[in-house]
Amino acid sequence: MKEKKVILKLRGVTKEFEEGQVLKSTDLDIYEGEFVTLLGPSGCGKTTTLRIIAGFEEATTGQVLIEERDVTSLPPYKRNVNTVFQNYALFPHMNIFKNVSYSLVEKKISKKEIKERVTKLLEMVQLGKMEGRMPNQLSGGQKQRVAIARALANEPKILLLDEPLAALDLKLRQTMQLELKTLQKSLGITFVFVTHDQEEALTMSDRIVVMNKGNLEQIGTPKEIYEQPKTKFVADFIGESNIFEASVVANEEETLTLMMENGHVKANGTGFKNEEIVYICVRPENVRITKEIVEGFTLKGFVADQIYAGSVMRTIIHLPNGDVVKVNTHPMETPLEIGSLVNISWDVDKAVIMHTTEDTVYDAIEFGLLNSQGGLEVNEK
């Protein structure tokens, strides 16, 4: 199998403003042809990281390397990267063709090549018959396509996208997610995408970098991030989760027996000690509601509500101590009586057990191991 080429490296990159440090020492490898998303809440450092890669922001310490060339001190136009912004930044007095071709004209590329390149790009973003229109004649989605085509005109090695879909309505945003992913695969260039939207990240990414308070919390494929969160923050931030605190009371052949305040449960896990306090994370779709007791589980609760949500039925279970369990089931299942007592369980391999250590940080380089996808697995630091 051909070894993946690292196109972008961050080494010990930090950023401090007057109000404090917004990006802690960051090491990150991004591969050629990869779609990587920097995902996290407002203020986590994702946009700062993107701006440092682009050259719009100067790192306080550390290095940025593109194709092994140190570009840390170079201006944006010397880095062979382009950026697509949320506000499109189109020239209002130029038509679509002139907007897309602007940088090529400035570089004095031949008119023939400009025509060929711009025509091809406009076809790729489904605007082939609209090259004469002005920006004020375009919808939000069309403006975004023009901005992407313009950013690709210079044939950058890396395309940076700073929350480019945030201003679009839900339906258009979902359409653009698929279009962007298809475009990226057809071009084969590296996309680094910034968003706070989990659905965007899960839908489009080859790998996701989850950020929190200036740290890289976890790096992995969408499946790894969703099904095997490494920290409570990741489990809580990505999708819906039921997160409980429990104590390990028995450990037999990688199956843990755990005591919650409301009863005993089981889950798979290694590296945990008896009497250790841990977090249990179970996704709502993996929780089972039964009238019968399941071996190894003594967790009971009362049905507080059932909500029809189209593709799923959301059931809310209240435990005796006031904790809430969210359960997603098929809407065709027989409704439960509100107030009825039920048993709660799950398959032992569907629960994720996490240490309760605060501020767990993952360093993708110093402690990195190649996973089955060729990406970096990260271990606790």
Each PLM stretch: what is its role?
Residues 8, 23-25:
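Conserved structural motif at the start of ABC-family nucleotide-binding domains
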Residues 26-37, 91:
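Pre-Walker A (P-loop) beta-loop-beta motif of ABC nucleotide-binding domains
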Residues 35, 74-86, 90-233:
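ABC ATPase nucleotide-binding domains
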